[in-house]
Regions:
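Conserved nucleotide-sensing/catalytic segment adjacent to the nucleotide-binding pocket
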Residues: 82, 91-143
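Conserved lysine of the Walker
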Residues: 61
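Intrinsic-disorder/low-complexity detector
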Residues: 259-348
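Walker A (P-loop) phosphate-binding loop of P-loop NTPases
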Residues: 58
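NTP-dependent small-molecule kinase module
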Residues: 2-37, 41-44, 201-205, 219-265, ...
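The Walker A (P-loop) glycine that initiates the GxxxxGKT/S ATP-binding motif of P-loop NTPases
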Residues: 55
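Hydrophobic positions on the alpha1 helix immediately C-terminal to the Walker A/P-loop
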Residues: 64
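ATP-dependent NMP and nucleoside kinases share a basic, alpha-helical "lid"
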Residues: 146-202
Length: 348
C-alpha cells in the first residue's frame, strides 16, 4: 500500500461508522470517469437512470456506493447520484426468526443463513423498482445496530440512482426479472479467499465473537460469495477488488450479449432499418411468394440453412463459455434433448 497515495474517508453505512481508504489515482482514473459516463447516459435518456452495483459480500460495495455519491456532489459537470441499498428488502427479523429455507433437502432456520437470496422480499423489491423509474419513493434501509429493516427512511429523488447489493444480477428463479429494471450494470469481482477475513472482521465489528464470526462465514457468507460469483448475469462493466482494497477495471471481462426481439422491433415506426434488416425482410417476402407458387424446395433449403447457422451460433456460445447450457435452454427455449443433440454434433 506504501506505493499508492491513499485517501481516508469516514462513512456511515447501515448505522455503523466506517473508516475506509481509497487510492487517489483510482478515484481520478476510474471512479470519476465512471460518474461522467453515467451522467452522459442519463442525459441521453432524459429520464431517471438506474445503475446496479452488484458484488459478493465483503467487496466494499456499500462504502464504494456512498463514496461515488459523495464524489458526484463535488465533481464539475457530473450529475449528482443517489446511492441506495438492497439490504432494506430483507424480511423483517421476526419473520426471519420464524421461518426456514430448504438446502439440500433439509430445512434450515433463516436466521442461520441471513443474507442469502431466500431471506429477501423480492416481490416488494420489484414493486419499488417499478415505482422508482418514474416517481420519487421512500426507500427502506437495513440498520446493522438493530439487525433489522427500517421502512420508508430515505426519499429517492435524484436523476441517477445507484443501487448496490449482492443479488441484483442473480440468475435464480424469482430474481431473474430484477435485471430488466437496470439501465446500466456494474459488477465487482474478487478472489473468494481474499474476502474471508474481511467478512469475519465485519461480523466482529457487529458484535459477534471470533468463533461466532468464523462459524457464520462457513455456513453463510462463504456460500453467498460463491453463489454471487458463479450465478450472476454478466454486467456491462466489471471492476476487480485487489487484495490491498484497491479497485481496477477488468477490461477483458465478458460482456452480456444484447438480444433483440425482432418482432417487437418491427412495430416501432421510428426504427431506422439497416441494409441487413431490409434484406431479411425481402427474403421473408420471397419465401412467402415461393410458397404461394408451390416452390417449397427453395423454402425448405433456406430453412435448413438457417437451422444450421443457428446450431453453429449455439455451439459457439457454449464452447466459448459465454453461455452455460442452462442459459441456452432458457434463452433460446430449447428442449434438453435438442440442445444435447446440437452439442453432440460438435463432438462428432
Amino acid at each position: 500500500m506504501a506505493d499508492k497515495l491513499w485517501r481516508t474517508c469516514r462513512l456511515m453505512i447501515n448505522g455503523l461508522a466506517h473508516k475506509v481508504q481509497y487510492n487517489q489515482e483510482t478515484i481520478d482514473s476510474l471512479f470519476l470517469p465512471f460518474l461522467r459516463r453515467m451522467t452522459n447516459l442519463q442525459q441521453k435518456k432524459g429520464q431517471r437512470f438506474l445503475v446496479y452495483l452488484a458484488a459478493p459480500p465483503g467487496t466494499g460495495k456499500s462504502t464504494l456506493a456512498l463514496l461515488l455519491e459523495k464524489l458526484s456532489q463535488m465533481g464539475d459537470g457530473i450529475e449528482q447520484i443517489q446511492a441506495v441499498g438492497l439490504d432494506g428488502f430483507h424480511y423483517h427479523s421476526d419473520y426471519i426468526a420464524s421461518h426456514s429455507v430448504e438446502r439440500d433437502g433439509k430445512k434450515i432456520p433463516m436466521a442461520m443463513v441471513k443474507g442469502c437470496p431466500e431471506t429477501f422480499d423480492v416481490d416488494r423489491l420489484k414493486e419499488k423498482l417499478q415505482a422508482v423509474k418514474t416517481e420519487d419513493v421512500r426507500w427502506p434501509v437495513y440498520d446493522r445496530r438493530r439487525h433489522d429493516v427500517v421502512e420508508e427512511v430515505v426519499t429517492v429523488r435524484r436523476n441517477i440512482i445507484l443501487l448496490e447489493g449482492n443479488w441484483l444480477l442473480l440468475r435464480d428463479a424469482g430474481w431473474e426479472d430484477i435485471y430488466s429494471f437496470a439501465d446500466y450494470t456494474l459488477f465487482i469481482t474478487a478472489h473468494a479467499g481474499d474476502l474471508k477475513d474481511r467478512l469475519i472482521q465485519r461480523k466482529i465489528r457487529g458484535g459477534m465473537t471470533q468463533r461466532e464470526a468464523e462459524s457464520f462465514y462457513e455456513r453463510s457468507d462463504k456460500l453467498n460469495v460463491e453463489r454471487v460469483l458463479r450465478q450472476s448475469w454478466l454486467a456491462q462493466e466489471t471492476w476487480r477488488l485487489l487484495p490491498d482494497g484497491d479497485y481496477v477495471l477488468q477490461a477483458d471481462a465478458p460482456k452480456p450479449v444484447q438480444m433483440v426481439n425482432r418482432s417487437s422491433l418491427w412495430k416501432k415506426p421510428d426504427v431506422r432499418r439497416s441494409e441487413d434488416d431490409i434484406m431479411i425482410d425481402r427474403i421473408q417476402q420471397q419465401l412467402a411468394a415461393y410458397h404461394a407458387q408451390g416452390k417449397d424446395d427453395y423454402a425448405e433449403g433456406y430453412s435448413e440453412g438457417m437451422a444450421a447457422a443457428r446450431r453453429d451460433i449455439l455451439r459457439n456460445l457454449y464452447n466459448s463459455g459465454r453461455m452455460s447450457s442452462k442459459e441456452l435452454l432458457s434463452t433460446f427455449e430449447l428442449a434438453p434433448e435438442d440442445l444435447a443433440d446440437i452439442l453432440m454434433r460438435d463432438k462428432a
